[in-house]
Structure formats: structure tokens, C-alpha cells
A protein has these predicted regions:
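A structural boundary/capping signal
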Residues: 1-193, 198-202
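Phosphate-coordinating loops and pocket residues in cytosolic domains that bind phosphorylated ligands
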Residues: 205
Length: 205
């Protein structure tokens, strides 16, 4: 009963989670040519969700240059969120991530992409969403995510509480269909769709 209750609580709101592996098939679908693992070494002065400023601050004090690219998270094994991210390129051409993140430590899966620079709005980095299956409810759900992210970029990161509430309300109407899709497309040995980090057969199956 305890495990079921915990899983039910997580499933009420699916969380994006870090995939343990990104297959070559998935990378092609995402349009990613190069994926590398970058050492995470948070700078003492760095703030979460502030990677570009963190990198620029680090470079001012220690040298190096900015390397832009993408990091990845998964929703219910049915969609991928690609978040633009900045890391430090050291003089020896190695990369380090200096931004703290409670969900990622050790090594960060990172796809270098200098074209991200053209997508930056007032130092705010964009996200992209890619559906892994063809379903209208999922397309509608992702469209809400895209709209919310565009508002974030256009408003320099400040989104009114009333706007957020409207986004959440619209998304909640689609949520039952999204949850059913996640259950349907998660195998027993896949990472559980709820984002717990456990295999499905030991979690929400």
C-alpha cells in the first residue's frame, strides 16, 4: 500500500526525468549529431537555472569560453524536452558544467550546438519539445508547453501567476490522456513513467 500511494502521488503530476541512456535512434529523432558527457562541478557563486550567467561569471574569474548546447529530460517516455544550456570550455578544450542542479550530478549528457546563440532572448535560453509518439493529445499538451516557454522568453523570465494558472488548467484537462499514453508506452524494464528513477515493474506497473 505504501509503494502504491507514493507512486499515485507522483503520477498525479508526471515529472520530467533524466534518461539513463539516449539511444542512437533517439538522438537521430532529436536531430543530435554529437552527445558527450560533461563533468558537473558547480561553482561556489553559481545559481540554479542561471547557466549562462554562471558560465560568464566563471570565465571572468578563471578564463575559458562559453559552449552552448542542449541537455535532455523525458516526460512519461513519450516526449523529450531539450533545454538549451551553457557550459565552460576550458583552455584545453575540455568542458565543465558549473551550474548546480539537484537532479544532475557527476556527468551531464550534453549536445554541443553553437546555433543556440541565435535563439537566446535577453540571456534567457529556450527549450524545444519533441513528441516520441504520434498522438493528438500529446501534440496539444506540447503546444501548451511551447506557448508557456515562449511567454517566458518574451517576458524576460517573469510570467504572471494568473498566466501560469491558465496554462496549468489547460494542461490538466489533457492530463488523463497523457498519463494513459505514458502507461501504454512504458515497458516493464523501462524507467518508470512517473519519474521515480525505478524500473516500471518495481514502481507503478
Amino acid at each position: 500500500m505504501r509503494r502504491y500511494s507514493a507512486c499515485l502521488a507522483r503520477s498525479i503530476s508526471l515529472q520530467y526525468f533524466d534518461l539513463p541512456d539516449l539511444s542512437s535512434v533517439l538522438l537521430r529523432k532529436l536531430g543530435v549529431k554529437d552527445l558527450i558527457k560533461v563533468r558537473v562541478s558547480p561553482d561556489v557563486a553559481a545559481l540554479p537555472r542561471n547557466c549562462l550567467n554562471n558560465v560568464n561569471s566563471y570565465i571572468e574569474r578563471h578564463g575559458g569560453s562559453v559552449q552552448l548546447g542542449w541537455i535532455f529530460s523525458c516526460l512519461g517516455n513519450i516526449a523529450i524536452k531539450m533545454t538549451a544550456h551553457a557550459v565552460v570550455k576550458l583552455p584545453d578544450n575540455s568542458l565543465i558544467c558549473v551550474t548546480p542542479n539537484e537532479y544532475r550530478s557527476g556527468l551531464l549528457k550534453f549536445a554541443p550546438d553553437s546555433s543556440v546563440e541565435d535563439l537566446i532572448h535577453d540571456n534567457f535560453l529556450p527549450t524545444k519539445f519533441v513528441a516520441l509518439i504520434d498522438d493528438q493529445s500529446l501534440k496539444d499538451y506540447i503546444a501548451i508547453e511551447v506557448e508557456q516557454d515562449q511567454l517566458r522568453l518574451n517576458s524576460k523570465g517573469v510570467v504572471a501567476a494568473s498566466d501560469l494558472q491558465q496554462f496549468h488548467l489547460r494542461a490538466s484537462l489533457l492530463y488523463p490522456a497523457i498519463l494513459n499514453l505514458a502507461k501504454k508506452h512504458t515497458g516493464r524494464n523501462d524507467q518508470c513513467y512517473c519519474g521515480s528513477g525505478k524500473k516500471n515493474k518495481k514502481c507503478c506497473e
